[in-house]
Structure formats: structure tokens, C-alpha cells
Amino acid sequence: MTKGEIYMRTLLLMTALFFCGICFGTDFPAIHTVRGELDKMSGHLQGACASQDAFYFGHQKGIFKLTRDGKIIKHVSAPPHSGDVCYYKGKVYSAVAYYDKARLGKGCINEYDADLNLLRTYELEVSTDGITVLNDKIYFGAGPTQQKLHRGNRIGVIPVDFKGKPEFFDIDHGYPTHFGVQCIATDGKLLFMSFYCHEYGVGVFTPDLKPVGVIKFTSSIGFGDFPQNKTADTVFFRVRQKYNYKKKEKPYFIITFHKYRNGKMINLSSKENKK
């Protein structure tokens, strides 16, 4: 073997090890929000999304914009029940299910710019939760909303420019759940829908809403795709709330990163630093 061949093999090995390190999580440490930073939150976290430089957390009465290290940049109020959020081409979309008596059972989709200035509201005749954008189409949860355990849900689809009327599709995610879809994410090819179900949690669908499979991955309060340029594969993130009732600690949130591989979500933040 020549020196040139040895050099090329060594270079290829180092490159492979570098990308393996990225793929298996050494570059995606868990992120913690500051204790008490989100005390203004109403109820529990409803959904989350990320841009190239910020996170967005949706709660029942508003949306937070946070830095990548979990500190608040801005908060805006929104009508209850404000639900899941998604980020697409510089804009934030929020699914809303109205809770007031006059509009109970109806909802809307709010469109914001990246600084959370409201651009427009698209009114709907159904309550909504769970939202993402794929191929310039908004996918949103459209019921049912009952707490009683049931199987099957309904998804609405509308162009991201809101031209035309929404289409509705009945789906079977393969397992019983409470309420409708809670959070939706995408890797640019498939849809990942999170439901209230501790046994499975996430149903995977094609863009035409054909079922692909289910994942045992609880992520009903915050789940999204994470924009980054380090790998060709999509990285997802999950948000969980952490607190200790006995110690009367103020809650904080932990963001971990995951990759979809062989029908499973692989944890890329295996070393979750304690706070």
C-alpha cells in the first residue's frame, strides 16, 4: 500500500468517525430552560417548534420565543386554547381551538412572522390542534376532541397561502388515544403525529395520510423538527417539563434531540445533564 493510499484511507476513516459522532448524538447535548423563566405560561406546554436561531413554545394563552439556550426573547398573548406551533420559511403557524361559548367547537390558524408579529388569522369551522407544513401545505388536527378513549382522528389540509378551502381526511393511527392530534412534525418526507397515548405516542404517515407505522415515543406537549445543517438526516426535538413537587421547585423544561431510524426514535442527547 502506498503512502497516498494510506493517507486516503486514514482521511476516509476520520471523516466517517466524525459523521458517526454527529449521527449518534455527541453534537446534540440536552438544553435546559432557566427555572422560573416560563412562569407566565398558562397551563401546560401545548407545542413547540424551532427556527435556525430560536425555539417557539406554545401554551394555552400565548407563544414564547426563546434563544437556543432556553432564555425568553419575547412573549405574545393568543386566544385560548392556543395549541401546537410550527415554523416554515420564516413564519410561525399556531393551531387554535376556541374555548369561549360563542365560538366553542370552532378554531383558527394564526400566522406570525419570526418575531411573533401577527400577520393574519384564518378562521375554521372546526377546533384545531397539532400543526406542521409539508410541501407548502398546512396539516392540522381537526378532532375529535373527546377525552374518552377512541381510535381514529381527523386531519385538515390547506395550502400555506390559505387559498382555497381546507380538505379533511379521516386517519387511523393504529392505536386508541385521548383527544385529537397534539403535535405534528415532519422530516420533509413523512408526517409524525403525536397523540395522548403512553404505549405508543406517535403515528407516522405519508403526505397523502397513508399510515406507515407507530413509534413508542411520548411527546404530546412539545415535539418538532430541528433546522440544522450538520447532517443530511432530519433531527427532531422533544420538550418535557421537569420539577419536584416535594421540594417545591419552580419547573423548567428540558429539550432533547432524536433521529428517526428503522421505525424508532434514537436519542441523540443520551447524557441529559442534571440541573
Language model segments and positions:
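Loop/turn-rich, solvent-exposed surfaces of beta-rich toroidal or solenoidal domains
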Residues: 173-205
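Residue position within the beta-strands of beta-propeller blades
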Residues: 57, 94, 140-141, 193, ...
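Short, solvent-exposed loop/turn segments at conserved positions within beta-propeller repeat blades
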Residues: 57-58, 100-106, 146-153, 196-198, ...
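A short beta-strand motif characteristic of beta-propeller blades
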Residues: 30-39, 70-77, 116-122, 164-175, ...
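Blade-loop segments of beta-propeller domains
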Residues: 70-107
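Repeated scaffold domains used in trafficking and secretory/extracellular systems
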Residues: 42-47, 79-87, 124-135, 176-184, ...
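Beta-strand-rich domains and repeat architectures in extracellular enzymes and scaffolds
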Residues: 35-61, 81-84
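Short coil/turn segments that connect the beta-strands within blades of beta-propeller domains
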Residues: 52-53, 89-90, 135-137, 188-189, ...
